[in-house]
């Protein structure tokens, strides 16, 4: 009976992974690569184009769904730290499969001060290697002012997430400056 239970559990887990389009970190855009350019509509039905942000540091984070507890915590953390991001010339972009209407509702309810993009066709999620069948994986790409991905985060606790991201940017900036001086 125990073996039957374990076998069924393993089959269910494997089926879920296959159906969800499970992606491993090896599928993500690699550190050191140029961030793929894309265009998507934001919550206000305005087109966001990554090429318009050339020369800016970027946080591009993919999240599963609007109104989920995890994303609410993550988004509100970015909202609360937004002025620090702006002082450091860093733009924040959130992306999910949700439709614009849902993104707009979520943004208004939580008073978000950054753009949230709708990738309902899953095209950008595929470009960045975070696509799954049901929703994109929770992954954050940190991009320098040259458009190069310098960090990929998929395992950080959501507590103080936005503050920790700022520290990663500051550390990268110090390391980049040291490399220039050498």
Predicted feature descriptions by range:
Residues 1-41, 175, 182:
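N-terminal targeting signals for export/organelle localization
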Residues 35-36, 57, 137-139:
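Short loop/turn microsegments at loop-to-beta-strand junctions
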Residues 38-58:
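A short beta-strand-turn-helix
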Residues 51, 128, 152-153:
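Short hydrophobic alpha-helix segments
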Residues 56-58, 63-67, 99:
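Short pre-active-site segment immediately N-terminal to redox-active cysteine/selenocysteine motifs
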Residues 62-80, 84:
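Conserved redox-active cysteine motifs that mediate thiol-disulfide chemistry
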Residues 91-93, 104-138:
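Short, internal strand/loop/helix patches
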Residues 137-182:
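Thiol-/selenol-based redox modules, centered on thioredoxin-like
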């Amino acid at each position: 009976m125990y073996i039957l239970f374990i076998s069924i559990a393993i089959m269910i887990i494997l089926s879920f992974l296959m159906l969800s389009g499970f992606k491993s970190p090896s599928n993500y855009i690699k550190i050191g690569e140029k961030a793929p350019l894309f265009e998507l509509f934001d919550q206000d039905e305005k087109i966001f184009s990554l090429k318009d942000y050339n020369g800016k540091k970027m946080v591009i984070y993919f999240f599963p769904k609007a109104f989920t507890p995890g994303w609410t915590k993550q988004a509100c953390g970015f909202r609360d730290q937004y002025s620090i991001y702006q002082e450091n010339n860093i733009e924040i972009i959130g992306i999910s499969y949700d439709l614009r209407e849902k993104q707009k509702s979520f943004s208004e309810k939580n008073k978000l001060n950054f753009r949230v993009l709708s990738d309902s066709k899953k095209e950008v999620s595929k470009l960045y290697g975070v696509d799954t069948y049901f929703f994109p994986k929770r992954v954050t790409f940190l991009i320098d002012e040259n458009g190069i991905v310098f960090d990929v985060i998929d395992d950080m606790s959501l507590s103080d997430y936005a503050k920790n991201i700022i520290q990663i940017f500051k550390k990268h900036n110090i390391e980049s400056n040291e490399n220039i001086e050498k």
